[in-house]
Amino acid sequence: MSERVILAYSGGLDTSVAISWIGKETGREVVAVAIDLGQGGEDMEVIRQRALDCGAVEAVVVDARDEFAEGYCLPTIRNNALYMDRYPLVSAISRPLIVKHLVAAAREHGGSTVAHGCTGKGNDQVRFEVGFASLAPDLEVLAPVRDYAWTREKAIAFAEENAIPINVTKRSPFSIDQNVWGRAVETGFLEHLWNAPTKDVYAYTEDPTLNWSTPDEVIVGFERGVPVSIDGKPVSVLGAIEELNARAGAKGVGRLDVVEDRLVGIKSREIYEAPGAMVLITAHTELEHVTLERELGRFKRHTDQRWAELVYDGLWYSPLKAALESFVDKTQEHVTGEIRMVLHGGHIAVNGRRSAESLYDFNLATYDEGDSFDQSAAKGFVYVHGLSSKIASRRDQR
């Protein structure tokens, strides 16, 4: 048996061409691995058969939907992770899981090399290769699209010359990546920052102006930072994401038009759709406002952003990320309760909160009868709190 290459296979043009190209250029057999992350679209069995038709000696489909939701989407929720305060890491959190399964396939199928179809301009090349280096430094990595400067035109020509059974056209307006956590769209006319997205950009969300007269009220319940119910009915993490994708997407919630700082040093425009993700992160953040002590909440907002940056930058397996997650596990001990929201016109409006772990004390907060806050103590507190600023100002005014 010849040396084998384990290929991350999407079923698209580049990775279909890569199967034949790797065989011709290296003489190695290719095992194609397709991961089901809830992306929808083509049936995974169709994708598996396409890989075989393109020349793979074996084609493996892994149903990783629950694993993705529990092990990758859930930490994103608990860390309120929005890169640059906007992007819920739709693609970034999927790459380490794909890496994990490619390494497992390499061990099972005798692979000495892993391969991906990433370009040299994006973040995914880093996420894949740093992941491989972390989990399996003995494996060689092939990146034919990047290392041999493939263009779409070159890939189509190769497919035609070698009778690769895939239907393609030379004009496709967008590059799309999607999974159950969301959908990312880039390139084409979107590369011009002044161009507004057209209707055909979107697939997970409806036009926010539709169904304007019928808002959807939803209650999301959490236990220790984990979403466990919707409108009082128990759900898995995957079930919560899927239901909220449908309900929030129908109200146009989760559309994001972002210019982001890529790891490779350039700025890139991306259109994201993440209805379920944005509802869950919004609800979780709001519940933390109710249940976390002030200093803990302030500090966690810093670690949330750092966690998002580490994941975006491909450092899923880093010691710092692991340490931050140990911290976050501790913070979630009291993040239990329910958040009520109205989904309407592309917006999420929180209008109710309840928790047995709440730090909100009505008697301390009220300005009406029953007020138990000792306002007479405030005068001395204000004096001491502002004393250092008062002394500094006195000096600076000399």
From Swiss-Prot:
<dbReference type="InterPro" id="IPR018223">
    <property type="entry name" value="Arginosuc_synth_CS"/>
</dbReference>
<feature type="binding site">
    <location>
        <position position="123"/>
    </location>
    <ligand>
        <name>L-citrulline</name>
    </ligand>
</feature>
<dbReference type="InterPro" id="IPR048267">
    <property type="entry name" value="Arginosuc_syn_N"/>
</dbReference>
<dbReference type="GO" id="GO:0004055">
    <property type="term" value="F:argininosuccinate synthase activity"/>
</dbReference>
<keyword id="KW-0547">Nucleotide-binding</keyword>
<dbReference type="InterPro" id="IPR024074">
    <property type="entry name" value="AS_cat/multimer_dom_body"/>
</dbReference>
<keyword id="KW-0436">Ligase</keyword>
<comment type="similarity">
    <text>Belongs to the argininosuccinate synthase family. Type 1 subfamily.</text>
</comment>
<feature type="binding site">
    <location>
        <begin position="8"/>
        <end position="16"/>
    </location>
    <ligand>
        <name>ATP</name>
    </ligand>
</feature>
<protein>
    <recommendedName>
        <fullName>Argininosuccinate synthase</fullName>
        <ecNumber>6.3.4.5</ecNumber>
    </recommendedName>
</protein>
<feature type="binding site">
    <location>
        <position position="175"/>
    </location>
    <ligand>
        <name>L-citrulline</name>
    </ligand>
</feature>
<keyword id="KW-0028">Amino-acid biosynthesis</keyword>
<dbReference type="GO" id="GO:0000053">
    <property type="term" value="P:argininosuccinate metabolic process"/>
</dbReference>
<dbReference type="GO" id="GO:0006526">
    <property type="term" value="P:L-arginine biosynthetic process"/>
</dbReference>
<feature type="binding site">
    <location>
        <position position="117"/>
    </location>
    <ligand>
        <name>ATP</name>
    </ligand>
</feature>
<dbReference type="InterPro" id="IPR014729">
    <property type="entry name" value="Rossmann-like_a/b/a_fold"/>
</dbReference>
<dbReference type="InterPro" id="IPR048268">
    <property type="entry name" value="Arginosuc_syn_C"/>
</dbReference>
<feature type="binding site">
    <location>
        <position position="124"/>
    </location>
    <ligand>
        <name>L-aspartate</name>
    </ligand>
</feature>
<dbReference type="GO" id="GO:0000050">
    <property type="term" value="P:urea cycle"/>
</dbReference>
<keyword id="KW-0963">Cytoplasm</keyword>
<dbReference type="GO" id="GO:0005524">
    <property type="term" value="F:ATP binding"/>
</dbReference>
<dbReference type="InterPro" id="IPR001518">
    <property type="entry name" value="Arginosuc_synth"/>
</dbReference>
<feature type="binding site">
    <location>
        <position position="123"/>
    </location>
    <ligand>
        <name>L-aspartate</name>
    </ligand>
</feature>
<dbReference type="InterPro" id="IPR023434">
    <property type="entry name" value="Arginosuc_synth_type_1_subfam"/>
</dbReference>
<feature type="binding site">
    <location>
        <position position="127"/>
    </location>
    <ligand>
        <name>L-citrulline</name>
    </ligand>
</feature>
<keyword id="KW-0067">ATP-binding</keyword>
<dbReference type="GO" id="GO:0005737">
    <property type="term" value="C:cytoplasm"/>
</dbReference>
<dbReference type="Pfam" id="PF20979">
    <property type="entry name" value="Arginosuc_syn_C"/>
</dbReference>
<feature type="binding site">
    <location>
        <position position="119"/>
    </location>
    <ligand>
        <name>L-aspartate</name>
    </ligand>
</feature>
<dbReference type="Pfam" id="PF00764">
    <property type="entry name" value="Arginosuc_synth"/>
</dbReference>
<comment type="subunit">
    <text>Homotetramer.</text>
</comment>
<feature type="binding site">
    <location>
        <position position="87"/>
    </location>
    <ligand>
        <name>L-citrulline</name>
    </ligand>
</feature>
<feature type="binding site">
    <location>
        <position position="272"/>
    </location>
    <ligand>
        <name>L-citrulline</name>
    </ligand>
</feature>
<feature type="binding site">
    <location>
        <position position="260"/>
    </location>
    <ligand>
        <name>L-citrulline</name>
    </ligand>
</feature>
<keyword id="KW-0055">Arginine biosynthesis</keyword>
<comment type="pathway">
    <text>Amino-acid biosynthesis; L-arginine biosynthesis; L-arginine from L-ornithine and carbamoyl phosphate: step 2/3.</text>
</comment>
